[in-house]
């Protein structure tokens, strides 16, 4: 269909004669530290940076914040870091679909474990298979950028429900304002 996503740190200009030019405005300055750094030091520094990032986002909002919890590694880590940083009242939200044949439609069994372990205020939303297809075009029209897969519709439907309870959520995608 000719629509493609630009590379990170670039912008595109198109002149009146339809000449296209892609330009880079930013490149990450990623350099390895000088000297020998142990695996333990990398782990400690990564933990510090992740904790700082999550805490910064929690403290930057003047409204209650939630977490979109799939039960996967990334969203579970966000919940764990929030709890570790002293946030007692963590709101979490999960979505699931009906099972089809042998394929599980929800990952509630995983998110439930995180909810139990970290004692979050949790809401689950189960979407019927009949609801997904009619909402697909609406979900695509409201996306900031093209996404493919069942989770694209899931993210949209979950966001619709979550927005009734909070306006800012953290997710494994990025911090999102609903």
PLM feature spans:
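N-terminal segments that mediate ammonia production and transfer
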Residues: 1-40
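ATP-dependent adenylate-handling active sites, centered on carboxylate activation for C-N bond formation
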Residues: 16, 29-178
């Amino acid at each position: 269909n000719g629509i493609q996503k630009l590379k990170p740190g670039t912008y595109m200009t198109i002149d009146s004669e339809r000449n296209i030019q892609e330009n880079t405005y930013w490149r990450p300055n990623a350099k390895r530290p000088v000297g020998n750094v142990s695996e333990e030091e990398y782990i400690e520094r990564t933990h510090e940076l992740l904790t700082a990032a999550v805490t910064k986002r929690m403290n930057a909002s003047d409204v209650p914040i939630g977490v979109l919890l799939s039960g996967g590694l990334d969203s579970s880590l966000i919940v764990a870091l929030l709890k570790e940083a002293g946030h007692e009242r963590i709101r979490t939200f999960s979505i699931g679909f009906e099972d089809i044949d042998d394929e599980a439609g929800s990952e509630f069994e995983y998110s439930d474990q995180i909810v139990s372990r970290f004692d979050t205020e949790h809401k689950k939303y189960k979407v019927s298979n009949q609801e997904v297809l009619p909402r697909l075009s609406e979900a695509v029209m409201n996306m900031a950028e093209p996404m493919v897969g069942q989770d694209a519709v899931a993210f949209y439907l979950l966001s619709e429900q979550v927005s009734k309870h909070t306006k800012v959520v953290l997710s494994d995608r990025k911090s999102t304002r609903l």
